[in-house]
């Protein structure tokens, strides 16, 4: 069974390193959530690459841009860390912090 993972700060250098490790072992891991502060373009590209359905963007301007940029797709984009209370307890085995 795949381990479900959330990566906080996935667009940082540490976050990108974590994604590279997971990419090499996709059969054992499924990413359920990615977060970023302002870098919504990288975040959305990561979501496409790893088939992630839940994203959190903490910067309001970036959140609005991301919603317009990715309108109509099957990805849920949340605007702050409060949404983690809803997503994390139900969906993930591990939370990796790269903030």
Question: What residues fall within each predicted segment?
Answer:
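Residue-level detector of flexible, active-site-proximal loop/helix-junction positions
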Residues: 38, 62, 84
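N-terminal Rossmann-like dinucleotide-binding module
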Residues: 1-53
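Structural motif
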Residues: 8, 34, 58, 78, ...
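Conserved N-terminal catalytic core of the sugar/cofactor nucleotidyltransferase
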Residues: 42-78
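A structured beta-alpha segment of the ubiquitous adenosine-cofactor-binding alpha/beta core
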Residues: 67-99
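Short, ordered loop/turn segments at secondary-structure junctions
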Residues: 12, 60-61, 82
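Alpha-helical scaffold segments in soluble metabolic enzymes
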Residues: 17-20, 45-46, 65, 86, ...
């Amino acid at each position: 069974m795949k381990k479900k993972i959330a990566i906080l700060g996935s667009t940082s250098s540490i976050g990108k390193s974590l994604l590279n490790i997971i990419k090499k072992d996709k059969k054992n891991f499924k990413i359920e959530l990615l977060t970023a502060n302002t870098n919504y373009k990288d975040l959305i590209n990561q979501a496409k690459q790893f088939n992630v359905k839940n994203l959190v963007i903490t910067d309001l301007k970036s959140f609005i841009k991301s919603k317009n940029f990715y309108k109509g797709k099957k990805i849920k984009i949340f605007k702050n860390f409060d949404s983690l209370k809803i997503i994390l307890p139900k969906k993930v085995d591990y939370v990796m912090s790269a903030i």
